């Protein structure tokens, strides 16, 4: 079990269920310590397609099943939005998806670690992201 709150960052894909499940494990089953966030860039619709709409609806249900709240946000600064959400909930752990294979182009985990040095950032290998 970890100290503080656990924040899970999801995309509009059903495979993010694995991230929510992993986040729930970090809480050790403690109620009220899990939040899920999806950040869409400003100008993009949250429900950009039927697939994404269905996936986000599914992830809302999965979040509820784990006793988590789920927030949808718009921001041109995805990292900044996640940092704000993490500070707001006194986050101790952030859970992110990481694609299988080459991750050299991904900057978000490093940016989060730099801006939130006291928060553990965990990357979970997912398929389809």
Where are the regions that the model predicts?
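Charged helix-capping and loop-helix junction motifs
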Residues: 51-56, 106-109
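Structural motif
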Residues: 9-13, 75, 97-100
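Gly/Ser-rich helix-loop-strand patches that form or flank binding pockets
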Residues: 93-129
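A generic structural signal for well-ordered alpha-helical segments
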Residues: 27, 63, 86, 114-116
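General small-molecule cofactor/ligand-binding pocket signal
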Residues: 35-37, 69-74, 122-124
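Structural beta-alpha unit
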Residues: 64-93
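A short acidic, amphipathic alpha-helical/loop segment
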Residues: 21-23, 82-85, 108-111
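Small/aliphatic-rich secondary-structure junction motif
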Residues: 1-53, 62-64
């Amino acid at each position: 079990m970890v100290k503080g709150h656990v924040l899970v960052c999801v995309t509009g894909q059903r495979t993010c269920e694995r991230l929510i499940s992993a986040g729930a494990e970090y809480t050790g089953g403690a109620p009220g310590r899990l939040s899920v966030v999806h950040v869409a860039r400003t100008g993009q619709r949250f429900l950009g397609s039927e697939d994404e709409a269905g996936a986000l609806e599914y992830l809302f249900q999965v979040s509820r099943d784990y006793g988590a709240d789920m927030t949808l946000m718009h921001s041109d600064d995805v990292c900044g939005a996640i940092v704000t959400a993490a500070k707001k909930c006194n986050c101790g752990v952030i859970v992110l998806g990481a694609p299988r294979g080459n991750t050299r182009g991904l900057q978000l985990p490093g940016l989060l670690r730099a801006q939130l040095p006291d928060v553990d950032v965990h990357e979970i290998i997912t398929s389809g992201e």
